[in-house]
Regions:
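A structural signal for short loop-to-beta-strand junctions that line the ligand-binding cleft
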Residues: 20, 102-103, 110-111, 141-186, ...
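Hinge/lid segment of periplasmic solute-binding proteins
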Residues: 30-47, 97, 118-177, 217-230, ...
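Short, well-ordered beta-strand elements
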Residues: 51-62, 83-88, 112
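C-terminal capping/gating helix-and-loop segments adjacent to ligand/active sites or protein-protein/ligand interfaces
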Residues: 58, 419-479
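Extracytoplasmic "Venus flytrap"/periplasmic binding protein-like
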Residues: 75-154, 185-196, 314, 322, ...
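Extracytoplasmic/periplasmic substrate-recognition and gating elements
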Residues: 78, 84-86, 189-190, 297-300, ...
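Extracytoplasmic/periplasmic solute-binding protein
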Residues: 158-173, 178, 202-273
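Glycine-centered hinge/linker elements that transmit conformational signals in sensory
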Residues: 205, 261-304
Length: 480
């Protein structure tokens, strides 16, 4: 178990921020985020009337994560009686970003929120996020050098990508990656090896199609109505949940380029525009050509091919033997008719073993009062304690964001348990032991549109068998 923990930390320390300067050095060139605030004192916060300092926390999460945050809020409010934590739950990440942008333009902005780097880029246009550097460096409420170093380096890098000074615009909150979920009984019954490369995936999928062609409905309880599904064109050996992740991951795995950040002369990232690379990258074309070939053979596709939102729906009833999806979504496999195994997703070559780092970060909005900012900061610190980020991981399946959290006995004991979440954490340990690198792509306002249009292009290429160049150029045209 200690070996697993060491491997995870090694991997996260090697996170690659693609197309961006990692921003840890350089002379002062301007402020990317709002710095015009004063770090209030805890004494003044505690002197306020009970519940009078209201911190609104906007989140897009489902019930499981929401309930865990509510538990944290209850604990925090017991420590700071003058503070009230109000959760504002918005249904969906995009809806949350849209609501926040609208509020920045004239509504009631939350005190704090979570978001992806491209969300933060949009908020930074108007400096609606504060720089956390004042809080981090404050001798009374900040982090020591040792505490700050306890955060996983890759997660910190993502939050410091917007200028050459490495300004903190947020801290990591809920983090995940992707994994290959597979039908254990099928692989064991027919003596198949779980694929580690895309070439092996092609071979295994061919074997699967040969095997299932001779099977009857309900011949195996862990395969379901296989003959009917085949006859209806509703069986695919492997599905990939996220078209956006599929698009960018395969480009990186083939050594291509997706996007790049643009640095202005003052050392700040241009948060309103970036450079598209996927449409001119020969390696990107090669990647899509290869995957389209697998799709034409009926080996791999996306949930859209079955008119589904997630591949886990098909996997759970035997319409797929493998599904590539988020490690944060392991709970969706709980109702599968088979035993679910977890492994790293396939890669192209040893030189490009890339896997995406995903999940949100947490920030404080500049419109809040100084007392509200302090209360929000203290709440963030509370939730990101090693014990709390480990508790969050064990409850939700997301990864701890502090290195010392991986060494806590409660977390170590949990890893040895039978839950799907623990299985995922153990199953993806090879990401650290076998030379994988997490990547995070460049972010700017509108880069989420790039991702969305590239997901559409991926559906066209994989599901609809559209001409690759046409699909890519159409995506560029839609992006504008």
């Amino acid at each position: 178990m200690k070996k697993f923990i060491t491997l995870v930390l090694m991997l996260l320390a090697a996170c690659v921020l693609v197309g961006c300067n990692n921003g840890s050095t350089g002379s002062k060139t301007g402020d990317i985020a709002e710095t015009n605030y004063t770090v209030e004192t805890v004494e003044n916060l505690n002197a306020q009337a009970p519940g009078s300092v209201v911190v609104s926390f906007r989140i897009p999460f489902g019930t499981k994560i929401e309930n865990q945050i509510r538990d944290f809020a209850d604990e925090f409010q017991a420590l700071y009686p003058s503070v009230t934590i109000e959760l504002e739950v918005v249904s969906g990440y995009d809806e949350m970003k849209s609501a926040t942008i609208q509020d920045i333009g004239g509504g009631k902005v939350p005190t704090m929120t979570v978001g992806y780097p491209d969300h933060f880029a949009e908020y930074l246009i108007s400096k609606s996020i504060i720089s956390l550097d004042k809080f981090i460096k404050d001798p009374n409420v900040g982090y020591t050098t040792e505490e700050l170093a306890d955060f996983l380096p890759g997660y910190i890098t993502e939050n410091r990508q917007f200028d050459k000074n490495g300004t903190y615009v947020g801290l990591p909150f809920n983090k995940s990656t992707e994994a290959l979920y597979y039908n254990v009984e099928f692989f064991e019954e027919f003596n198949l090896e779980v694929p580690t490369t895309w070439d092996e995936m092609e071979t295994v999928c061919a074997q699967i199609m040969t095997i299932v062609a001779g099977l009857e409905d309900d011949q195996y309880s862990w395969l379901g109505k296989i003959k009917t599904n085949l006859a209806n064109g509703e069986f695919i050996p492997c599905l990939y949940d996220s078209g956006g992740n599929f698009f960018t991951t395969i480009i990186h795995q083939f050594g291509g380029e997706y996007t790049k950040s643009i640095y202005k002369s003052n050392g700040l990232v241009d948060v309103q525009r970036g450079t598209l690379c996927f449409n001119t990258s020969n390696e990107a074309y090669e990647a899509f050509e290869y995957l389209q070939g697998l799709s034409k053979k009926g080996y791999i596709s996306m949930p859209d091919a079955l008119e589904l939102t997630y591949g886990s729906y098909a996997y759970n009833v035997g319409k797929a033997i493998m599904n590539i999806g988020s490690t944060g979504g392991s709970g969706y496999y709980a109702d599968a008719i088979c035993t679910t195994g977890v492994a790293p997703l396939p890669y192209k070559t040893e030189e490009h073993k890339n896997v995406i780092q995903q999940g949100t970060n947490v920030c404080i909005m500049s419109q809040a009062s100084d007392l509200e900012k302090l209360a929000a900061w203290l709440f963030i610190k509370y939730m990101l304690q090693p014990e709390k980020t480990a508790e969050f991981a064990m409850t939700t399946g997301y990864m701890p964001v502090r290195q010392s959290a991986y060494e806590l006995q409660d977390y170590i004991d949990w890893l040895a348990g039978p839950t799907n979440e623990a299985k995922v954490h153990n199953g993806t340990a090879k990401y650290a032991s076998e030379g994988w690198q997490y990547f995070v792509d460049a972010a700017w306002a509108g880069s989420s549109t790039v991702r969305n249009e590239c997901e559409t292009a991926m559906i066209q290429i994989i599901v609809n068998q559209t001409d690759i160049n046409q699909a890519l150029q159409d995506a560029v045209g839609r992006i504008g």
